């Protein structure tokens, strides 16, 4: 299946900047191949304007479900008296997969984030057989959050492709090693750390974003 879910350990982990980097990488190194981007569902203010302004029509992007309140989807939907029709999301994904060589799916919250009253993002990733990258912010507490999210992923049988460490602020190599020690995380989770995304002040610098992703030797988007 030609799809990759970008999930995270929590909200504000940097999924959008990592996803932007993956888009920039794909467009730079695989310009002849079509790329689609899907926001699984959006609550509150979204990133659609960000992506559209940055890639200016070069990217097929869809957001099947949107809710106004910046809350967990079932809570936001309840406030509006609406349902969460996952069938609509699934059909939108199938349609995008048919027309694109690769579809990047930006998730929401952590893998334990509820997408309905019964299902979490991890449930959805497993049921829809989505290969998943886990974005981990470089900060205090990241190790325990990573272990917990991957334990949930294993319980739900999510196809985890690996971990991306993301710097939300400028970090030295020593800080990265102390806050998110790669060997320790890999030992505790049996999940590979594929790369580190450094803090980039200008998130519109697509060449720099693409070069970061290109420096991760284990990332092979063309083989998904």
Curated annotation (Swiss-Prot):
Binding-site list for substrate:
43
One GO process term, biological-process aspect = biotin biosynthetic process
- EC top class, as a word: ligase
Location of the protein in the cell? Cytoplasm
- CDD domains named among the record's database cross-references: DTBS
Its annotated pathway reads:
Cofactor biosynthesis; biotin biosynthesis; biotin from 7,8-diaminononanoate: step 1/2
Q: Which GO terms describe its molecular function?
A: ATP binding; dethiobiotin synthase activity; magnesium ion binding
Q: List the InterPro entries.
A: DTB_synth_BioD (IPR004472), P-loop_NTPase (IPR027417)
Cofactor(s) needed, names only, are:
Mg(2+)
Role description: Catalyzes a mechanistically unusual reaction, the ATP-dependent insertion of CO2 between the N7 and N8 nitrogen atoms of 7,8-diaminopelargonic acid (DAPA, also called 7,8-diammoniononanoate) to form a ureido ring. This cyanobacterium does not encode bioA (which catalyzes the formation of the precursor for this reaction in the cannonical pathway), instead it encodes bioU, which replaces bioA and also performs the first half of the cannonical BioD reaction. Thus in this organism BioD has a different substrate.
Q: What is this protein called?
A: ATP-dependent dethiobiotin synthetase BioD
| Source organism (scientific name) | Microcystis aeruginosa (strain NIES-843 / IAM M-2473)
Which gene is transcribed and translated to give this protein?
Answer: bioD
């Amino acid at each position: 299946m030609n799809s990759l879910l970008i999930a995270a350990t929590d909200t504000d982990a940097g999924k959008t900047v990592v996803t932007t980097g993956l888009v920039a990488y794909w467009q730079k190194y695989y310009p002849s191949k079509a790329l689609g981007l899907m926001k699984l569902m959006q609550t509150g203010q979204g990133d659609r304007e960000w992506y559209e302004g940055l890639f200016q029509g070069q990217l097929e992007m869809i957001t099947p479900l949107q809710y106004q309140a910046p809350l967990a989807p079932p809570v936001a939907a309840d406030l509006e008296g609406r349902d969460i029709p996952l069938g609509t999301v699934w059909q939108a994904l199938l349609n995008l997969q048919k027309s694109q060589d690769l579809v990047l799916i930006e998730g929401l919250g952590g893998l334990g984030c509820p997408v309905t009253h019964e299902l979490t993002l991890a449930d959805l990733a497993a049921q829809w057989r989505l290969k998943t990258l886990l974005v981990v912010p470089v900060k205090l507490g990241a190790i325990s959050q990573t272990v917990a999210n991957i334990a949930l992923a294993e319980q739900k049988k999510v196809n985890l492709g690996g971990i991306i460490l993301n710097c939300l602020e400028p970090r030295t190599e020593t800080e990265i090693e102390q806050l998110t020690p790669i060997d320790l995380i890999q030992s505790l989770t049996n999940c590979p750390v594929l790369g580190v995304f450094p803090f980039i002040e200008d998130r519109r610098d697509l060449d720099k974003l693409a070069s970061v992703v290109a420096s991760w030797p284990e990332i092979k988007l063309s083989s998904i």
